[in-house]
Structure formats: structure tokens, C-alpha cells
Amino acid sequence: VEIRGTGGFLGTYGIMTLDKGRLTVDKVATDSDLKNFPAPVVDLGPDYRQLYGNSPALWVNMNMSPNFPYAGQQWAKAWELQTGQRLDGVLGLNVTALQYLSEATGPVTGAKGQTIPADQLVDYLTNGIYADFPELSGPVNDARKEFQAQIGTDLLKRAINFRGSAASLLPELQKSVTGGHLLLWSAAPDVQRVLTETALAGATSTSPRPYLQLVLNNGAGNKMDYYLTRKLTYTGGACKGQWRDSTVDVVLTNTIPAEGE
């Protein structure tokens, strides 16, 4: 719900095991279990420090950069420091990826017993669920986090144990990858080099050519991102020798209603 460079902040995490081609979900929990640090756990260089300062010392801020390999490195190291367990990789998926899994495997049940079809799941998880759990602290907030984790767990297990036609699941997974909603970082350098050549890596461009990316981070913790719309327009100017003047217009609009929910 709160924007970070790679999508949203880490609110739910899980541990999975891949053994002889079989993937199992060992544990899913909320960020309440995760212990923050006094300083960032990985030194990603002076440019990174200048941009983000000490904020990535918190688990929920380790993906402020849009470069997912940075997030993967930090989350893996933070998990090792907290638990002593070394991870082989980090898989990131957001609520849109969950929607695509629901498209293939069926609707989910909301907190009040209501049926949530796939095309309403993102809206429910980013907005509607707060009407079902109308407090942002205390036991009600904890219950909301647990319920969100339950939805994610259910959809992951459905996908892992999917017995339907691959023709219905694979296109949804492909949409997740090409849209940047399903990302993977590997702790094995050789594997990561291969991943970096694909959309699955979520890596920012290292090309020496001009490159521009709009990146937003919510530092207020207010869950209001649902009401933010973004529009970016790029206008390329005529080439003048080795140079060209271009214009980028960014419009951020607050659509919060004047009253009501």
C-alpha cells in the first residue's frame, strides 16, 4: 500500500524451499516479526547512501531503490543477521501479481466472508481491507496483517499445487514478470548474471545512454498511495550534433475524496 522504488513496501514475507524441482511454502508471516537495524546491512556505495541515507536500515525501506537486486541483497543479509539462515535468493511479488494468480486459480474470500473476484483483488488489498480492519495500530491492525498474509499464502499454494491447464497459469505468470510485479534475485553470482538479462531481475539500466525513470517513495506511512495518480510525458527534442533537448513532465494528482471513505 505504501509506495517503494520496486513497487510497495514489505508487509508480508515467506520462506520457501525448492528441493528436487518441488517448491514448498515453509512459513508466511507479517513484517511485525522482522527486526530493524541501526544502519543499512549492505554497503551499496556512496551514491546509494547519498540518495537514501539511513532509511534502508528498516526492512520496509530496503527496496527504496527501483533496482531490485539491491533489495534482494539487503533482505537476504538482514534475514541472515536476524536468523542465522542463509538464503539462496529472494522472490518479490506485489498485489498485482496476486491478482494474476487469482485470475488463474479463482477468487478469494474477504475478511467479512465476501467473495473477492480477481479483478477486484488489488482494490481490496490496497483499500477495501482497511474498511474491514479500520485501525492502523493495535490488535485490529495486527489482525489485518495476518489476514493479508493468509490471502498471499493461499494464492501461492494454489499456484504451486496447480492441477489445471498450464495454458491458464503461465500467461498470468508471464504478465507478472513483464509488468515488473514478480521479481527474482539470486545469491549465486552466475545465476544472477543470467537473470540480469531478463525482466525477472527487476534491474535498472546500466547503459551509458541517457536514461530516466520516475521513482516514488512514501515516507509518511499514511496508506494514502491508493489515491495518488501519476502521469509522465516525455517529449524528445531535435538532435543538435551529439545533444538533444528533451522535456519530461510529471503530474502527481491527489484524488482523495473530500469526505467519506
What are these language model-derived features?
Residues 1-261:
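Non-catalytic, solvent-exposed segments at the cell envelope interface
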